[in-house]
Amino acid sequence: MRHVLIVGINKVSIKYVCDAIRSAGFEPILSVDPSGFHGAAKAVFEGVTCIPAFTDTDALSGYLKANEALVGKIHSITTFFDELFPVVSAIAQKFGFNAPPAVFARLSSKEFVGGLIPEHVPAESCVALADGDFVLPWLTPGVKNDVVLKPAVGSGAVATTMLSIAADVDPASVIKSAILESGIDDPEGIAWIVQAHCVGDLVSMEGFVQDGRVVFLGLSRRDRVGFTEVANQFPANQLIDQSVRSKIETAVRDLVSRSAFDNGFFHCEFIATPSTAYLIDANMGRLGGASIVEQIALAYDLPPATVLQHVALLPLGLLDATLEYKPVEECRQTLSYWYCLDHEAIVHDWEVPQMASIHTPIANVGSVIQPIGTSDYAWIGMLTGYAEVVVREIGQVLVHTDRGPRRPVFK
């Protein structure tokens, strides 16, 4: 049997990925650490070949070289994390695996995307400390400028921060200090995006391109506390003005056309204002993370594994048939709370009664979890379902921590 190696998958999608791959006649190999999963979720790994979790090309290459028998089984390699497409592309080329198109790897760079569609992104510059001095010509002189600083390749708001640059200080010095204090490995060795801060609603266009046809599944609208996304509504088309939705669709179509992107999903993030929208992250080649797969499945009356099979196999050219989606206007409203705690804590367990909504533990038991507002790594768990049901049931979830039992925090 042909095997598909999956490098990078979240704790929601992993519940369905084995069924998704096997029902198409393939066998999954998961590059994942099962110890990070809670309770019943570990049953997913029974009878499945797992290898260590890799995010580095050299490390994964070394592992595969040392396991020739495993390499002989692998037909294809893919990922559900857009920042890992460069790793997947390099490994596929080195070992001769089938893989998503190479443009997926190039599109993981925010700098590359901004260069393709500059009219659709906020004013921005790509900087690297290794390159020496830099200037930001688009800053407004003589006033305070608010900017967002983030790695050029990355997701989940890791190492993302908002900076207020006073009128009387050197912008480059402020940005250099923030990069050095970011807390990530080798901040001097990577590229960073400095982007004008935009105020508005955080929305994402979910959809895919198949054989040159762009399909928009609908808008997600997310609530944030600081840099943590805490709730997601899907579909949320009715919450955004038609003219702004058209601007969003134009931006996606322009990016697809100019990059020659095809046969893959997208999760394009925008800041939407009452009159326009700015693309802030393209996320090309993958479905939205967190609970998006469950929300699309619920909205469109499809099994999550069916949606995930479409996501995984479309870029690999392994689909037997086209999956048809009903009009978004016929979809039922879904809601997911990506809940947190309001203080740093160690999570011990969850207490969740029988309910209609779908609950997914996210935090690693025994690990210190940061409070809401820091990044998406503050997530404790997710509760997903039809909107009116989730609102009613979220209060039934209880999280046991080193500081006692706590209720979910999501606002």
Question: Which role does the model predict for each range below?
Answer:
Residues A123, D146-L149, L163-V199, T228-F234, ...:
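Conserved ATP-binding module of the ATP-grasp superfamily
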Residues N237-R245:
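A short, structured beta-strand-centered segment in the mid-to-C-terminal lobe
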